[in-house]
Amino acid sequence: MRFSQLFVNTLKESPKDAVLKSHQYLIRGGFIQQIGSGIYNFLPLGKKLLDKVRFIVKEEMDKSGAQEILMGFVTPAELWRESGRYEQYGRELLRFVDRKENEFVLGPTHEEVITHIAKNTIKSYKQLPLHLYQIHSKFRDELRPRFGLMRGREFIMKDGYSFHSNYADLNREFDVMEATYKRILQRMGLEFKVVEADSGAIGGSGSKEFMVLAPCGEDTIVVCKGCEYGANIEASKRAPRTAPRPNEIKYDSNAPQAAFARFFTPDIKNIESLSAFFKVDKFWTIKAIVKKAIKANNESELVYFFVRGDDEGEETKMLNAINKHTNCYLALEDASVEEIQAAGLEVGFIGAYGLRHITQATHIYFDESLRDASNLICGANEKDYHFVGVDLSTFEGLEYADIAQSKEGDLCPKCAQELYYTKGIEVGHIFKLGDKYSRAMNAQFLDNDGKTQPLIMGCYGFGISRILPAILEQKSDDLGCIWSKEVSVFDIAIIISNTKDSVQNDFGSALYEILSACGIDVLLDERDERFGVKMKDFELLGFHSALIVGKGLNEGKVELIKREGLKKYELCATDKEILLEEILKIIA
């Protein structure tokens, strides 16, 4: 390709709403063009990037034994009702009605469609296992689309679905997909972490996310200093807590030794002041968290959570706790002071004693770190009073769950070394769906005993368009994009410094033909522009490398620059065969 024929328009300035460098560079480099909120066109350079990513993903998926299909972008709403997700998914699911009053959705994910395919195709265990995948556009009606391709409303995704006769085979395929995704990310030259994750609206269990490490990542990852453990903060675990965190101790770290008693605590409404009042570490206090749980029909109720005073509640964990038995709640919101008072409680003095009797609440949960704990201080459900000497082992029927957020300094559940936070961009997610969808949609097969069984399913998503900003957030520099060779739009750009110099022109054009004949994807920059402009474009667009044909040619020299690190190589240009060997060796 000759640069003069390339449909691209680079910009010096970034759009005002482009916060992340990936968004800025993709717009400035002419890779993408915004046409609506969270909706982008992919111009030739952007489309070629997508094709490179698609090729890697398809090659690795096919190698794993999966088969590619293509499902409709539009899905009948009845399939989503059949699975039970039509109401559960919320307003991110774009719904519409056609001229015949038939209801449809734009698919953000395709579990329902693939289950429908399997239901009408798979009849016997002899047809299993089966793994089908597609690479297709999706639509999620994000409330606040932002950060360019990182969180758009329309996006391109590889979503795969596997079907099995038993859980052992699902586990095998899950491991195969984990290894496949690792190979994909390694081929793209990325530093990443595989972490435990929450299954969210997809459902199922055994969920893992693939995080590209980057400071701007939306996800907080909890990572161990001593082993390979890692988890999204929403699903992170920690070793049992038996003492305050050493780095947070402010008052006496020992358990307060006091008989059970009711104390007058005037205007002591938060954990900080409670800890100061009794001169004890916050670890020995109980923090009450009151939330309003929202159902699909917009009905709501107050739910109650208790954690150690030096902990915070983790919202996803808390939502999972109340959904453990009914799975009818969509979200949690902070309860207002008025709502708490209407329940008969005083803000700042809420405690475990008599709570169910006062509020008639269905959902009251205690964090696992409080299981059978003693020597505690909690609210007395009475204004200006707290209880000391609280012993939860004397309570009957308490429901415990992992609802606290793991904090830096907590200990790893696997090796007991310290945990710390880092940031990541989720680019892949794999799930063990089990029979969640097959039971709901009656997708069955006959086992080897002739008995009807629900299909066992797995689900595997990879963000084709999202990986582009992820690469840039990790790899790019202050000058522009940096793409690895496998992803770069062109393997090498030949930049003719002075197009008015016939020697430079002839040499550059001849080398362009030689490299192209060798199967190298080459861009010949023969534009009548200043050399500085051409170099700025090379740095912005991030092609893997560039060969500079300039004044050095008079002395039999050309210069090769690798975009990552801008490392320079001076090459002898007198023998084109030797020069070709050197170029191929460096850009390999």
Swiss-Prot record:
GO MF term (any one): ATP binding
UniProt comment concerning the protein's domains: Consists of three domains: the N-terminal catalytic domain, the editing domain and the C-terminal anticodon-binding domain.
Functional summary from the UniProt entry: Catalyzes the attachment of proline to tRNA(Pro) in a two-step reaction: proline is first activated by ATP to form Pro-AMP and then transferred to the acceptor end of tRNA(Pro). As ProRS can inadvertently accommodate and process non-cognate amino acids such as alanine and cysteine, to avoid such errors it has two additional distinct editing activities against alanine. One activity is designated as 'pretransfer' editing and involves the tRNA(Pro)-independent hydrolysis of activated Ala-AMP.
GO annotations of cellular component type: cytosol
Alphabetized NCBIfam families for the sequence: PRK09194.1 (NF006625), proS_fam_II (TIGR00409)
N-terminal signal peptide: none
Identification of the protein by name: Proline--tRNA ligase
Encoding gene per record: proS
Superkingdom of origin: Bacteria
PROSITE patterns: AA_TRNA_LIGASE_II
UniProt keyword list: Aminoacyl-tRNA synthetase, ATP-binding, Cytoplasm, Ligase, Nucleotide-binding, Protein biosynthesis
PANTHER family according to UniProt: MITOCHONDRIAL RIBOSOME PROTEIN L39/PROLYL-TRNA LIGASE FAMILY MEMBER, PROLINE--TRNA LIGASE
Catalyzed reaction equations: tRNA(Pro) + L-proline + ATP = L-prolyl-tRNA(Pro) + AMP + diphosphate
GO biological process assignments: prolyl-tRNA aminoacylation
SUPFAM superfamilies: Class II aaRS ABD-related, Class II aaRS and biotin synthetases, YbaK/ProRS associated domain
Cell location: Cytoplasm
Subunit structure: Homodimer.
